[in-house]
Amino acid sequence: HCISSAASDVYKRQHLADTNFFRSLKRKPVIINTSRGEVIETGALLEALDNKSISDAIIDVWEHEPEINLELLRKVIIGTPHIAGYSADGKANATRMSLDAICRFFRIERNYEIHAPVPNSPVIHAENYENALLQIYNPAEDSDRLKNQPELFETLRGAVSYTHLRAHET
């Protein structure tokens, strides 16, 4: 079982997953946070990991980042340096949103299109879907880098690369 956060900007988002939330869980899910760091209360998540009310946690966004909780980083199965927005799609969307806001502010007609670059098509040799996905991107590699050098959170965040794809290109 898995619970993944995808909090909207419309609703209350601070500490949606707090001590009461974790204590109310009937099963022991894996918790995944890729939305906003403040959605999950760090202390409550640590308590849930310690008392085994959840199976594990995967965290990409951290409460109080870039000052991340090192104890939590050590305890999660995968912890990455808020890399979700660093994909080509994420950068294209952020650029489009910025240009939209500038055009609205200056009352400029929006007559442009922004597209994410077309990704390379890697050749993947795998016996199953899991191995195929790990050839494209293995989050454990970024997790290991962050766990080994948490003080480089911002540097690692900007340095996420997909160079391993190039090894599989035709």
Please annotate each region the language model reported:
Residues S4, F22-L25, L72-L73:
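A short, aliphatic-rich alpha-helical micro-motif
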Residues K28-E169:
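Rossmann-like dinucleotide-binding domain for NAD(H)/NADP(H)
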